[in-house]
Amino acid sequence: MHEQIMPLRCGHTICYLVQGPTGSLLIDTGFAESLGQLGSQLKMHALDLQIVDYLLVTHFHPDHMGIARDLVELGVTLLLPSCQVPFVHQPDHMYVRDHNRAFRPIREEDACRLEPEDSRKFLSAHCGIDGQVVQTPGHSPDSISLVLDSGDAFVGDLCPFDQVELYGDGQMRSSWEKLLGLGVHLVHFAHWPDERI
């Protein structure tokens, strides 16, 4: 595996920096106030925010996309699959309701559209990352995962594999079957410890 994986804790959300030979991809952000936390986490690894080339949000809940626009304004490219477009502004009302002045809504026109079927070619060309984006609904209808050829998968808030049967959710089961079919054996969650399958 030539990708380096770095977990970064932003509040209660674990974000991941996946570094390829030619570029890097941040998976998820924390809440709107977490830009400083992200910067501090990177600094602990002798890095800064300029290391981040692309951002992929596993699903549009407030604790996964809160600083997306801040990062875009710092030069990071937000990758946005069409399956997520209807959900981009879903968390906005929560920030407005809570009078959160740190939050700024995403501007869709600032995002780079990236369809899952094109993701392998894009990630290879722009980051040197061998992997692909796949739709994995279950936790939310807009959930996506990044699956690396190494067998690592970044699944956001998809429930752990060993709990799938507790939910009795066919969509969640189907998403896990898709991940297993792609050879996933090490799962990185946003709120759970890693799970080896």
Language model regions located:
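Active-site HxH/HxHxD metal-binding segment of metal-dependent hydrolases
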Residues: 33-35, 43-121
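Short acidic-hydrophobic surface loop/beta-edge motif
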Residues: 8, 18, 119-128
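A general structural detector for well-ordered alpha-helical segments in enzyme core domains, enriched
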Residues: 38-41, 67, 172-178
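Short gly/ser/thr-rich secondary-structure transition/capping motifs
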Residues: 8-9, 39, 110-118, 135-137, ...
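Metallo-beta-lactamase
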Residues: 32-33, 126-197
